[in-house]
Amino acid sequence: MPSKLAAEPQLVWKTLLPSGGLGGIAANDKFVILGHRDFSDFQDVFHCLDATTGKSLWQIEYLAVDNLDYGQSPRTTPSIVGDQVVLLGAMGDLHCVELATGKILWHHNLKTKFAVTGDLPWGYCGSPLIVDEKVIVEAGGAEASLVAFDLKSGKIVWQTPGKAPSYGSLNIGQLGGRTQIVGHDATTLGGWDVDTGKRLWTLTPPIEGDFNVPTPLILDGKLLVATENNGTRLYQFQTDGTIDPTPVMENNRLTPDMSTPVVVGNRLFCVNRFLYCLDLNRGLKELSRKRDKVLGDYAAMIADDAHLLVFGDGEILLVDATQDDCPIVARQKFSDTKVDVFSHPALVGDKLFLRSGEIVYCWSLASTDNAKANQ
């Protein structure tokens, strides 16, 4: 993470794609993976670019036709694990491919395999969760709400009954002395045993209608949940791994539609038209709430232990996360026009991979002094 931003962005490369996209970018020091649509808008395309040059290395494409809200492109972020990458399209096509070559190792369509009949107007949005050589997804079938596949073979390890999926991603961690998967289905919050898929607990929020897009966070054995109707809540757990349904902290002003909070030390940050900063040591008390011209309903964020990068409409904001007033200490414009960025960027070292419309950029966030020293 940079501690300052250069006055002007330093472009390493840019690549034009046939379409924009909503799904996040996955990257390491060699490969950049992302999903989009072909020119006809009949096919999903997952694309691998060279991280150094931006040149295309491989792509897979397959027929995927629907009439989803907000377009048909993949919503999820690819999951890189070792020499493989797991890809999930909006219509339920789940692939595991070789990272270096794009060779397809296995494939399932979740909707057809598990007879999913529920209405999914936004498609599959939750990114695959990789745990102990298992690929865990919300399939959304009545007898297969959550499914775990073997990473190597694609065979089903377990499946568990339940409801249609939410539009957020799952998380995993230690809660109440148990390692468990946590997340939302269409209407409830829940926990599942990672080895068997058995549902451990269910919590129905007091106000109906949450889209359940933000991903729950696990913080020191507690669960932080933020949604648009029920606000931001922190829950503790019983010794048997079940949730205590009464929150230990609440903030009813922070009600994000889409943004997942980020925690730095005792401060919780989230964007929902403002940049909010809440204090985890004082009952989620609001420390600051900043309005900025580049902030809307959603912003991706990346943090270290002192700074926060916020990706707004056409600009990057650098925030000092160590002060209660959370000042914006630098900003950098990456587009001359106001562009909504719904695709989560990837930061590898000082290289930022960011999608804006149909263009994928690689920016160097190294300071100009460091850049000159390395020339």
Where are these regions (language model features)?
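Noncatalytic, solvent-exposed loop/strand surfaces
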Residues: 1-375
